[in-house]
Amino acid sequence: MKTISNSTLNENVLLPDYDRSTLKSRIVHLGFGAFHRAHQALFTNEMLSKTGSDWGICEINLFGGEDLIQSLRAQDHLYTVAEKGAESTEVKVIGSVTESLHPSLDSIQAVLEKMAEPQVAIVSMTITEKGYCADPATGTLDKNNPLVIADLANPTEPKSALGYIVQALKIRRERGLTPFTVMSCDNVQENGHVAKAAILEFAQLLDPELRDWIETNVTFPCTMVDRIVPAATEETLTEIAELLGCEDPCGIACEPFRQWVIEDNFVAGRPDWNVAGAEFVADVVPYEEMKLRMLNGSHSFLAYLGYLGGYAHISDTMTDEGYRKAAFDMMMQAQAPSLTMPEGTDLEGYAKLLIERFTNPSLKHKTWQIAMDGSQKIPQRMGGSLRFHLAQGSNFSWLATAIAGWMRYVSGVDEQGNDIDVRDPMAETLRQICDQHGLNVSVVPALLAVEAIFPVELGQNPQVIDAVSSAYQSLIDNGARATVAAL
């Protein structure tokens, strides 16, 4: 079978230009998904190209993804990333992966032994928010989670990422080895703190002494990651095969932009990812807030109002001058003033770059996809800036319009009377409220009263109720496109 490792590839493909045989698995990564392939593994590939160091990655999938691991092995752990710009595509073969494991292909013990090897200095992860087994209401470990229950009952045969990390650290401690750094790369606010809290709480239930050792000896740097990486489709893989010169079932496409901000807090050394464009900083939080409010907040605005306006993709909304202007104004007038950034941060430059990213037509990022899980996203993306404007007495009409757009969207019926497939953990609750009120402005205070989404000081604030009601009424009377154009 022809694969990347034994085929003559097209001449414009960028191949690893370093000696892969010298690499050691100094990083173990949990979660060989699309984002990691286009982000951390690619940064590592470029770092290796520039430094000639020996930081290789052992990839591990704990749940599903066996096919992906087998495909990766069949092609000597090489795979492709296609960076698709508006005008052209750059194809890179990534060589930073040294080996791979899967508990159901190898064994649980094989995974634990790999994590316990002396040269392993970092265990990184992209396991999604669910992987941290936290109770959404309290943020603490969900002791009723079936994985947590199973791992506490049988810690030497773990199932969860938490179980594997704690057991591997226990083995290292018993063998007198230095611990590794635990580095979350998930798109979760203060992800290092989330990982640390979950792991310490889990370890406390298992062995309080081990918990204390972990707290004293292990570091959990926070990271901020950014790159748009749509899920791979048959169309993507066909396109990659044509660009590459052979098939690659592990291939992934993404945008050219990438960002990685890392808290410089490592217990056993780290690669010089900064030579590949990563930034090492003392505090990641300001950068997270910048991304959450300016990128994610305007993304949500475009998702709800774009979908209602009949636009299938984010790039389609950017062909409408009203949406383009409103998104930029929202970033600069509603979100940027609410941020406290390190000196010299160019927020206007960042906003212009975001508009350029949103305009990229080759990504096909669906408004419907970004509109998912709004009840979880809106508080993070808009709550902080809403509080800022209420305190300052300044204009927050863009935020009010975004929230009204979400309310109109979760009614489950679009402007043509067609059903909307609303995907949200609270979809049922939201649907009941919307059904009670119909497309009537009385739905606004009813939805603002849902405290799991809007804390009382926001949801019961008369200015918020008035501004969102006014925007909602405009959506009913004039539709999304006219409402956005009038901002």
Regions found by a protein language model. Name each.
Residues M1-L487:
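Substrate/ligand-engaging "lid" and interaction regions
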